[in-house]
Amino acid sequence: EWKLFRRDFARYYEREVYPATLARTFDPYLARGHLDLPEFGFRVNINLSADIAGIDRPEGSESETDALVAFTRKFSEGATLFHSTREKSLVRQEVAAALKQFNEQFLLPSRSRREALLKQIEEGSQVQEAPRDILTVLLANRADQDLDDDMILREVAFFMQAGSHSSANALTHGFHEIDQWCRRHPEDRSRIMADDHFLQACVHESLRLHPASPVAWRTASEAFLLPDGTSVAEGESVVIDLMSANLEEPLFGSDAEHFNPHRRVADRIPPFGLSFGIGIHT
């Protein structure tokens, strides 16, 4: 899948796919004359995630989005099962049922269309390019990567969950921080509208203050020493305090706890802190 996420891929989605998806999701709210930002954030991100994942929505309807939202929220319960206060066996059953329904309603039709296209391309009878999405990449490489149907289902479903839930929250936090900043600093309002780099700085600053998770849990695959000399045995859990790291005053200044899109940090420090962790995501 990493082959997808290159500059030309991002440019293609930014210019070709996202505008149409945003417009389609916006239309019902424009007709009503109002929107709830968290709800809109979830719905627009679920559609953007579906585009990248390779989930077709032939009707382009609100009911299709409703179904995807319901499935994805249930997948989120499975992804955060460790923290659930509900009976875990019941949550597992519900997630399994949601996966089955998602597979039948969305994945199988999307997969059938892509398999037919890939076959036609292989035979030379199709001039249309294969869709540029995760499902197509998985299907095209399933033999080389030994991917079975269950693995493909889980991979696509997890991407749908990961690509929508935290992004919707980030949109809401970012909008709130920018709105509050402009109330205090009205001179920056026009700059946000005209300067993409400044808008990006606003988003990075909000992500630093509002990581998707305040901590990251890892299990040691072998024994090692932490930089301070603490010994960690194989199999022990290591908790990384992302929130505290993002508020380190030596790195982000004496006002680290506050939103400041004009903040300057050293080149080696990501402006969004450890909100995305460090290293390759697998």
Task: Describe every region a protein language model picked out.
Residues 9-166:
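Cytochrome P450 heme-thiolate monooxygenase catalytic core
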Residues 45-49, 53, 171-178, 202-203, ...:
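Buried hydrophobic packing segments
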Residues 153-190, 282:
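Cytochrome P450 catalytic-core helices
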Residues 191-230:
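Conserved cytochrome P450 K-helix E-x-x-R motif and the immediately C-terminal K′/meander segment
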Residues 216-218, 239-242:
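Short, conserved beta-strand edge motifs with alternating hydrophobic and charged residues
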Residues 241-267, 276:
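Conserved cytochrome P450 K-helix/beta-meander segment immediately N-terminal to the heme-binding cysteine loop
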Residues 270-282:
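Cytochrome P450 heme-iron axial ligand motif
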